[in-house]
C-alpha cells in the first residue's frame, strides 16, 4: 500500500499571499489542508468544513472596545494560568505578557510565550484598572474613562490578574 507523503500540487500552499495557520496563535496544534487554501476547500472537498483560520478571525482572539464610559480588552489566553501572565501599565500603554515553561502535550513538549501592547486612551482612569481571567481562558482588562479635563493618573504599575470560575461573557464578533 502506497502512502502519499506530499500533497498534490493543487492542495499545496501557493506562497505568502494565502492565509496559513503556520504562524498564528495555534502554532503547534496541527495544520489542516483547508487552512492552506480556504477558498478552494469547498470545491475540492465533498465534505466541506469551515476554515479554522476564518473562524478564529471572526471569533476575536484579541478584541479592543472603547466606548464613552469604558475601555476593555478581551484576549484569549486559554493556554496560560494567572501565574503565567503579567499585566502592567506604563504611561499610555498596557503590556500583557504570557509565558509558560516547557510542558508535555499530546504531540510532545511545548512552551509558549506572547507579548501584546495596547495604547490606552488618554482619559482612562489608570487607578481603577482591573484584569480578570475567566474559566474558559478569556483575559478581560478594563478601566473606566474619566470626564475630560480630569487627570487620569499616568504611572507605571502592575495589574494583578484575578481568576473567575465562570466562562467569559464576552460576545464574539
From Swiss-Prot:
Zn(2+) 2 binds at residue 107. Residues 145-173 are annotated as: Disordered. It is found in: Cytoplasm; Nucleus. GO terms for molecular function: metal ion binding; structural constituent of eye lens; unfolded protein binding. Glycans are attached at residue 162. The modification Deamidated glutamine is found at residues 6, 50, 90, 147. Pfam families: Crystallin, HSP20. The modification N-acetylmethionine is found at residue 1. Residues 52-162 form the sHSP domain. Residues 1-63 are annotated as: Required for complex formation with BFSP1 and BFSP2. GO terms for cellular component: cytoplasm; nucleus. The modification Deamidated asparagine is found at residue 123. The modification N6-acetyllysine is found at residues 70, 99. Zn(2+) 1 binds at residues 100, 102. Residues 153-167 have a biased composition (Basic and acidic residues). Zn(2+) 3 binds at residue 154. The modification Phosphoserine is found at residues 45, 122. Acetylation at Lys-70 may increase chaperone activity. Undergoes age-dependent proteolytical cleavage at the C-terminus. Keywords: Acetylation, Chaperone, Cytoplasm, Eye lens protein, Glycoprotein, Metal-binding, Methylation, Nucleus, Phosphoprotein, Zinc. One of its GO terms (biological process) is lens development in camera-type eye. Heteromer composed of three CRYAA and one CRYAB subunits. Inter-subunit bridging via zinc ions enhances stability, which is crucial as there is no protein turn over in the lens. Can also form homodimers and homotetramers (dimers of dimers) which serve as the building blocks of homooligomers. Within homooligomers, the zinc-binding motif is created from residues of 3 different molecules. His-100 and Glu-102 from one molecule are ligands of the zinc ion, and His-107 and His-154 residues from additional molecules complete the site with tetrahedral coordination geometry. Belongs to the small heat shock protein (HSP20) family. Contributes to the transparency and refractive index of the lens. Acts as a chaperone, preventing aggregation of various proteins under a wide range of stress conditions. Required for the correct formation of lens intermediate filaments as part of a complex composed of BFSP1, BFSP2 and CRYAA. This is Alpha-crystallin A chain. It comes from Ochotona princeps (Southern American pika).
Amino acid at each position: 500500500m502506497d502512502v502519499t507523503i506530499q500533497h498534490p500540487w493543487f492542495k499545496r500552499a501557493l506562497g505568502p499571499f494565502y492565509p496559513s495557520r503556520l504562524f498564528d496563535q495555534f502554532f503547534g496544534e496541527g495544520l489542516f489542508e483547508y487552512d492552506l487554501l480556504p477558498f478552494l476547500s469547498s470545491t475540492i472537498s465533498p465534505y466541506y468544513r469551515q476554515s479554522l483560520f476564518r473562524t478564529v478571525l471572526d471569533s476575536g482572539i484579541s478584541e479592543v472596545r472603547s466606548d464613552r464610559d469604558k475601555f476593555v480588552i478581551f484576549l484569549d489566553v486559554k493556554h496560560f494560568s494567572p501565574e503565567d501572565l503579567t499585566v502592567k501599565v506604563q504611561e499610555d500603554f498596557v503590556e500583557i505578557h504570557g509565558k509558560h515553561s516547557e510542558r508535555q502535550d499530546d504531540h510532545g513538549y511545548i512552551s509558549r510565550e506572547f507579548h501584546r501592547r495596547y495604547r490606552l486612551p488618554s482619559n482612562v482612569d489608570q487607578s481603577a484598572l482591573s484584569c480578570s481571567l475567566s474559566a474558559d481562558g478569556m483575559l478581560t482588562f478594563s478601566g473606566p474613562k474619566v470626564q475630560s479635563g480630569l487627570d487620569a493618573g499616568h504611572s507605571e504599575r502592575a495589574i494583578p490578574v484575578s481568576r473567575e470560575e465562570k466562562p467569559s461573557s464576552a460576545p464574539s464578533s
